[in-house]
Swiss-Prot record:
Its EC number is 6.3.2.1. ATP binds at residues 26-33, 144-147, 173, 181-184. It is an enzyme of class 6 (ligase). It comes from Chromobacterium violaceum (strain ATCC 12472 / DSM 30191 / JCM 1249 / CCUG 213 / NBRC 12614 / NCIMB 9131 / NCTC 9757 / MK). This is Pantothenate synthetase. Beta-alanine binds at Q57. The keyword Cytoplasm applies. Keywords: ATP-binding, Cytoplasm, Ligase, Nucleotide-binding, Pantothenate biosynthesis. Pfam families: Pantoate_ligase (PF02569). GO terms for cellular component: cytosol. The reaction proceeds by a bi uni uni bi ping pong mechanism. The lineage of its organism: Bacteria, Pseudomonadati, Pseudomonadota, Betaproteobacteria, Neisseriales. Pathway: Cofactor biosynthesis; (R)-pantothenate biosynthesis; (R)-pantothenate from (R)-pantoate and beta-alanine: step 1/1.
Length: 277
């Protein structure tokens, strides 16, 4: 596996890569990331993964400085997974002018759901992904459904800007007890880790209610919020939305997604379940 640190080297490598799949990450890799790599390997001749902890998508009081940097372990995992190249730019390499005057501004959905609690987050995501796409120039890129709102923003950006890159959604990787795999799971204490699957159980409860024909989304959402709060969670949101647009869902709609974000101790967990009736 080649390790590429500059934009010039990445562009030179890309010229001889053939059909190229790309997996952008912030490092601290786990089995969920490797699931994205496996999906990429199935679809292209070469796979490049990037590791870049993007300051622009962290808000005030968030964990940019504390975010785990595990470069050596990440390299070993990627090499074992058959990745052809790792793009590992410095902050100065990716943001050469230091200040970033031009940004990619997502639509109104960036201010809802996670965006309501993390102002500017999706602007930072859309901007860095655009920069990485321009540098790597992949044929396709794999994104996990666990970050459902992020996936929607990237898909909308690609469609609206007429980008030729194919976006491949990959199902959420889960632990045996249902907890969605996430780098932030490492922040959980042993007691919190035992409690964490409650989030997925509540999403599953809402899914079961929807599949049974319930149209009272508000009641299902409130029951989940109440259960989480009673167990000591701080709930940001639990919402049923349209799966394809993330707009507010109305009674009778067939393609839904249930999304939630809540804090367990100091750790913010997100998850979702698609419901196609």
């Amino acid at each position: 596996m080649e390790i590429i640190r500059t934009v010039a080297e990445m562009r030179a490598w890309r010229k001889q890569a053939g059909k190229l799949a790309f997996v952008p990450t912030m490092g601290n890799l786990h089995e969920g990331h490797l699931k994205l790599v496996a999906a990429a390997r199935e679809r292209a001749e070469k796979v490049v993964v990037s590791i870049f902890v993007n300051r622009l998508q962290f808000g005030q009081g968030e964990d940019f400085d504390a975010y785990p940097r595990t470069f050596d372990a990440d390299c070993a995992k990627l090499a074992a997974a058959g990745v052809d190249a790792l793009f590992f730019p410095s902050e100065r390499e990716l943001y050469p002018r230091v200040r970033q005057d031009f940004n990619v501004e997502p639509p109104h959905i960036q201010n809802e759901l996670c965006g309501a609690f993390r102002p500017g987050h999706f602007r930072g995501v859309a901007t860095v992904v655009t920069k990485l796409f321009n540098i790597v120039q992949p044929d396709l890129a794999c994104f996990g459904k666990k970050d459902y709102q992020q996936l929607h923003v990237i898909q909308a950006m690609i469609a609206d800007l007429n980008s030729p890159i194919e976006i491949v959604p990959v199902d959420t990787g889960r632990a045996g007890d249902g907890l969605a795999l996430s780098s932030r799971n490492g922040y959980l204490s042993a007691e919190e880790r035992a409690e964490a699957p409650r989030l997925y159980r509540n999403l599953s409860m809402i899914r079961d209610g929807l599949m049974a024909g319930s149209q009272d989304y508000a009641a299902l959402e409130q029951a989940a919020r109440d259960d989480l709060a009673a167990a000591g969670w701080t709930v940001d949101y639990v919402e049923v939305r349209q799966a394809d647009t993330l707009e507010i869902a109305h009674a009778g709609e067939k393609r839904l997604v249930v999304l939630a974000a809540a804090r367990l101790g100091k750790t913010r967990l997100i998850d979702n379940i698609e419901v196609f009736r």
